Curated annotation (Swiss-Prot):
Membrane topology: Multi-pass membrane protein
Organism per entry: Danio rerio
Bilayer-crossing regions: 49-69, 93-113, 115-135
Residue numbers spanned by region Disordered: 187-208
Gene Ontology CC terms: clathrin-coated vesicle membrane; endoplasmic reticulum membrane
Protein's recorded name: Receptor expression-enhancing protein 6
Single biological process term from Gene Ontology: retina layer formation
Key word Transmembrane helix present: yes
Amino acid sequence: MFAIFTKIKDRVEAFLNEKNIVTDCLNKIEEKTGIKKRYLAYGAAGVTGAFLLLGYGASLICNLIGFVYPAYFSIKAIESPGKEDDTQWLTYWVIYGFFSVGEFFSDIFLHWFPFYYVCKCLFLLWCMAPVSWNGSQVLYRHVVRPFFLKHEAAVDGMVSNISVKAMSAAENVTREVLHTLVRNRTVGPAESEPRSLPSSAHTEPTVD
């Protein structure tokens, strides 16, 4: 447990030494206040934890933690020449996707669970932790991968059938739309019958 906190601390220190929008803001605050950006970051983390405990904006904070940080490092992984970090973050997004779907269907019950957002935040931090046994790796190796390999053929067949049906439906809709447009253009608007104009001749009254 101590090793994971040490690695997280090293990752945070490396992040604070990089040049990005977060460190630029921290550097400006450090220049004005004289407080080191390391302590500013730790203070922000403490305030975030307090909001999670109190429940104010906890859902938004959890989503930002689970998305913004991994998205940033996923972009860096895409731009890097190596592929090891690509696999790491792809694994995280697979677990994040499954977790989000499960949370959607059980949110009405989990909303009343005490300190749910604190537990969710800790779970997401565990999934993105910079260690080989983080949550995404453990869950993928022991849950997702065995299930996928066991049902891969069935899943591929189902996806193929859905794709074929979707393409067929799209072709039918396109064909019907084109047929309707061609028919309307061929028939054209119906011609209205000519209306007779009133006679301009004035009839003189007859005198008996």
